[in-house]
Amino acid sequence: MVLGVWITLWRLVRLLLLLCVLPWAEGGKVLVVPMDGSPWLSLREVVRDVHARGHQVLVLGPEVTMHIKGEDFFTLQTYATPYSKEEFDQLMQRNYQMIFKPQHSLKTLLETMENLKKFSMLCSRSCWELLHNKPLIKHLNESSFDVVLTDPLDLCGALLAKYLSVPSVFLLRFILCDLDFEGTQCPNPSSYIPRMLTMNSDHMSFLQRVKNMLYPLMMKYTCHISYDPYASLASELFQREVSLVDILSHASVWLFREDFVLDYPRPIMPNMVFIGGINCANRKPLSQEFEAYVNASGEHGIVVFSLGSMVSEIPEKKAMEIADALGKIPQTVLWRYTGSRPSNLAKNTYLVKWLPQNVLLGHPKTRAFITHSGSHGIYEGICNGVPMVMLPLFGDQMDNAKRIETRGAGVTLNVLEMTSDDLANALKTVINDKSYKENIMRLSSLHKDRPVEPLDLAVFWVEFVMRHKGAAPRPAAHDLTWYQYHSLDVIGFLLAIVLTVAFVTFKCCAFAWGKCFGKKGRVKKAHKSKVH
């Protein structure tokens, strides 16, 4: 009995010693303000892992949404929107329809700008409603969050973080109008860094560099209608003039969904972290339904076809052209499509409303990937080493496709102009030409050869900001005027000195010349006068 007591006491001592040695871990509070649509898919993975590390997560989303739904690893707090579900769906439907209209007509351009204006107004009005919801703002203030995690493509989350005086972490692909470069004060020379949406590479001709330099000017109107309402709202809230850069410079860390395996080399700042491929991490087993499709494909394997979460219906004529092309290859095609079934759909093609894209791309029988070139799909293609046929539709997709094509890992087609034969030939090329597989496997090997996985890196930096209450180095460039940033005042000062020295030197030389040669000339002239 005495022995049993001693054993029990010894166990208690060991437990106390262990508790003394181990650091106390206390979960923090994370406020997430997501951008709806596909950006939420990456943010969602970070939220899942942050919750798994013992932190409380509150996701703040609008009542009217596409993808943001409550789940067991976060608490969803919704706020009222000044528009109905019907209004929102109608606007999004019009935007989808614009994708498949000729892009070079003036009418299409005007309609696109009008839809963008309406969408921007909905977003800014929704943000106004959120920030003027006094009970909700009071609740958020009292919750004492340690960090705000948001995508600054929609500036509402960044503005809310600044308004609550809470450190923020941005997770993004890019921001329109180079605002990500301005917000980080990262050098951005137009001579070799292609502007997003220009479809330029980092090796540009003279005319491409002209386009690259002028493109920000052409985007001014888009920036004005997209982001100026947020600057006005911020100025109203803070009772002083607040610029977009003021809002963005509040961020402690910027998590870019990029990787230099895909993107072109460029300067970066200390608080810029690259987590491209973050959506490749979580992979579940293939379901029996899709396992059956794959096993039935035989030696030819499968082709995965998806235009992303935003677009799953296309015009009937174009759908029939695509169906005809898919019937010309021996592979089994799994096509994520919710529209009307094309009447000419071949036996080798299966329509599904949803597919486990990342899991299917990782299967050894997958031969090719038909994608709209969204960043999620592109990185999943790279992670799994699958050559791609790219049908870019809008936004950064054209640039993503250009990057893959320049690396010899895929073929790009214009979805509006391509024929059935074009698509079939592109598929046969990337499947049968071994160079495409070799190039994508090389990219995959480079991308995966890293000390820390992208998802783990993202979670680390979120916790870093929580531990240190921000603590990111703030570039002094934020405190400079535009002419100080470009050293124009210094250049002007030095130029003034050079001109002054040159002027004084010239005057001195002129004076000396006059003294030395002017007098001699006058003497000679006087001598000649006496002779005559």
Curated annotation (Swiss-Prot):
Signal sequence bounds: 1-27
UniProtKB keywords: Endoplasmic reticulum, Glycoprotein, Glycosyltransferase, Lipid metabolism, Membrane, Signal, Transferase, Transmembrane, Transmembrane helix
Subunit note: Homodimers. Homooligomer. Interacts with UGT1A1, UGT1A3, UGT1A6, UGT1A7, UGT1A8, UGT1A9 and UGT1A10 to form heterodimers.
Plastid found in the keyword field: no
PROSITE patterns: UDPGT
The protein's name in its UniProt record: UDP-glucuronosyltransferase 1A4
Glycosylation, residue list: N141, N295
Enzyme class: transferase
Family: Belongs to the UDP-glycosyltransferase family.
The protein's Enzyme Commission number: 2.4.1.17
Protein function: UDP-glucuronosyltransferase (UGT) that catalyzes phase II biotransformation reactions in which lipophilic substrates are conjugated with glucuronic acid to increase the metabolite's water solubility, thereby facilitating excretion into either the urine or bile. Essential for the elimination and detoxification of drugs, xenobiotics and endogenous compounds. Involved in the glucuronidation of calcidiol, which is the major circulating form of vitamin D3 essential for the regulation of calcium and phosphate homeostasis.
Taxonomy, superkingdom: Eukaryota
Residues spanning the membrane: 490-506
Pfam families: UDPGT
GO cellular component: a single term: endoplasmic reticulum membrane
GO terms classed as biological process: vitamin D3 metabolic process
Cellular location(s): Endoplasmic reticulum membrane
An example molecular function term from Gene Ontology annotations: protein homodimerization activity
Gene: Ugt1a4
Organism listed in the record: Oryctolagus cuniculus
Reactions performed catalytically: glucuronate acceptor + UDP-alpha-D-glucuronate = acceptor beta-D-glucuronoside + UDP + H(+); calcidiol + UDP-alpha-D-glucuronate = calcidiol 25-O-(beta-D-glucuronide) + UDP + H(+); calcidiol + UDP-alpha-D-glucuronate = calcidiol 3-O-(beta-D-glucuronide) + UDP + H(+); calcitriol + UDP-alpha-D-glucuronate = calcitriol 25-O-(beta-D-glucuronide) + UDP + H(+)
Membrane topology category: Single-pass membrane protein
Transferase is among the record's keywords: yes
